[in-house]
Amino acid sequence: MTHQKRLSVPKSWKVGKKGNKWISTTRPGPHSQARSLPLGIIIRDILKLVDNSREGKRILSEGKVLVDGIPRKDLRFPVGLFDVITLPLVNEAYRMLQDEKGRLTLHKLNETNVNKLCRINNKTTVKGGKFQLNLNDGTNIIGSNEYGTKDSLILSIPDKQVVKHLKFEVGNLAMVVGGQHSGETGKIMEIREVKSSRHNTVMISGETDFETIEDYVIVIGEDKPEIRLGGEISE
């Protein structure tokens, strides 16, 4: 495994500074290293399913850990925001969320038959007049022109069928995933388009009213969140 010094891990990694000097890195994949955790660290240091890398390799090779419904067998596989980890043998599931400090945290779910939330980062035209939707977790799916950039989709897993379409518009609920308001949720009150090289901004009303840049905002529901945001946090 490729390693880095524990003291130099990204700020989004909620791992202790004490322990082994070296810690594994993520492999290039659906999420960047700055916005994901290696699966090996999750099963060893957070869920405490194993004591070492050798045991981790064994349970992954046996298909006992699913990410978004797919068995993953690489200790360095990157697990990022909104990804769902399922442990079929113990009938448990967890969703990766972000806390107010921008750190990735695993929240235990009440059931294992859950869906996945994704944001449409951009879309491209493909043959037949259809559109390829490029999602925030690296997934690409074919959809129609009704789906807009910055909209969110609720997808079934592992087959990634659209269960619900959430528009990026005033009145819907959103989560902030970057900046000083990271981890906060609230209602979109205004979307301010800037006719310059500066970022578009969004006014959000939650526990307080605040403004953040558009790229940090992900729609999570209409009248209520479409995904469970609470639950026991694994540390």
Curated annotation (Swiss-Prot):
SUPFAM superfamilies, sorted: Alpha-L RNA-binding motif (SSF55174)
Keyword Transcription regulation (UniProt): no
GO cellular component: a single term: cytosolic small ribosomal subunit
Key words of the record: Ribonucleoprotein, Ribosomal protein, RNA-binding, rRNA-binding
Residues covered by the S4 RNA-binding domain: 37-100
One BP term from GO: translation
Classification via InterPro entries: KOW, Rib_uL2_dom2, Ribosomal_eS4, Ribosomal_eS4_central_region, Ribosomal_eS4_central_sf, Ribosomal_eS4_KOW, Ribosomal_eS4_N, Ribosomal_eS4_N_CS
One protein family per Pfam: Ribosomal_S4e
Recorded GO MF terms: RNA binding; rRNA binding; structural constituent of ribosome
Domain of life: Archaea
Similarity annotation: Belongs to the eukaryotic ribosomal protein eS4 family.
Name of the protein in its database record: Small ribosomal subunit protein eS4
Species this chain originates from: Methanosarcina acetivorans (strain ATCC 35395 / DSM 2834 / JCM 12185 / C2A)
The gene coding this protein: rps4e
